[in-house]
Amino acid sequence: MTRTKYQQLQPEERMRIEIWKAEDVSLRAMARRLGRAPSTLMRELRRNATARGGYGAMSAQACRTQRLKASRPVAKLAPDGVLWGVVRHFLDQKWSPQEISATLKRAFPDQPDLNVSHETIYNAIYAYPRGELRRQLIACLRQARTKRLPRSRGTDRRGQIPDMVSIHVRPPEVNDRLMPGHWEGDLIKGAGNQSAVGVLVERMSRAVLLVKMPDATAASALAGFTGKLQSLVAPLRQTLTYDQGREMARHAELSAATGVRVYFCDPHSPWQRGTCENTNGLLRQYLPKGTDLSVYSQEELDAIADSLNGRPRKTLNWHSPLQVLAQVLANPTDRLPVQ
């Protein structure tokens, strides 16, 4: 026999009970008229009786509402709570809900009150009523598309860069991500393509370097990337994987100056530089599309890179790029576990 799910008395039913009680209708008769069990009405009259033993529909409904509120647990991320203050701090630092959740779990493994799932963080943000605070919180989140579009859907640019070396002859150890010093590169452009920032991402640690450039020409890319790569210790200068953007036309000069071998992806194949593509998505939190990138100094770009490199990454088992890179450079045979 299927058990019928119990339903609470509705306000209109309480109004009828008040009227019938005033008319001295028996409890069983009231239950029959409402299609309810007599025990339901007995419990209702006992719980919500007035001080003089009477019954009022409005006061009964108010008592019911008050009991319901009292039975609800306090929200874990209450706006005035300590945990929300911690979460808000990390959101302001552009951390994602997953990064925040994993960090709290690692920092406070035995304190469930200081742990929160990333779903709860998302729910807390979107539960805010419409207004400036809600917009600020949502702006802290990484903007993700349901479908990634190719970086370029223009004409095939093969043949425009002399002496390209294909990604298909790149050393296999680059794919393994077991050794540092193998980079992926890209150029993100600002408003009207009038400004640019060079991006370098180390494949093993996901560490990012940003380079201020006056424009997207090959001369600017050569000067910017050469200067940044020369600032690294020799073991971190091994290979660079790039798309067939014309800004890399002077790759031979880059290799001669830095010792970094440059390999080129197939046309329209952003997945062959997946680490850099993912990093570009993170960077858009700091450098939104349509921004005039020329207003950022190199010091400001370095601060953005430091912020990204200090964030825990799921793919690094919730270590940060800085932690992974520091560990490997200090003890090449003792690496932090990564996925």
UniProtKB/Swiss-Prot annotation:
Keywords for this entry? DNA recombination, DNA-binding, Plasmid, Transposable element, Transposition
Alphabetical list of SUPFAM superfamilies matching this protein = Ribonuclease H-like
**Keyword Repeat applies:** no
Q: Does the keyword ATP-binding apply?
A: no
- One Pfam family per UniProt: HTH_38
Gene Ontology MF: a single term: transposase activity
Integrase catalytic domain location: 176-329
GO term, biological process aspect, one: DNA transposition
What GO cellular component is one of the record's annotations?
cytosol
Q: Which domain of life is it from?
A: Bacteria
What function is annotated for this protein?
Required for the transposition of the insertion element.
NCBIfam families reported for this sequence: transpos_IS30
PANTHER family in alphabetical order: TRANSPOSASE, TRANSPOSASE INSI FOR INSERTION SEQUENCE ELEMENT IS30A-RELATED
Family, per entry: Belongs to the transposase IS30 family.
* Protein name as catalogued: Transposase for insertion sequence element IS1086
The species is Cupriavidus metallidurans (strain ATCC 43123 / DSM 2839 / NBRC 102507 / CH34) (Ralstonia metallidurans)
Q: What is the lineage of its organism?
A: Bacteria, Pseudomonadati, Pseudomonadota, Betaproteobacteria, Burkholderiales
Record gene name: IS1086
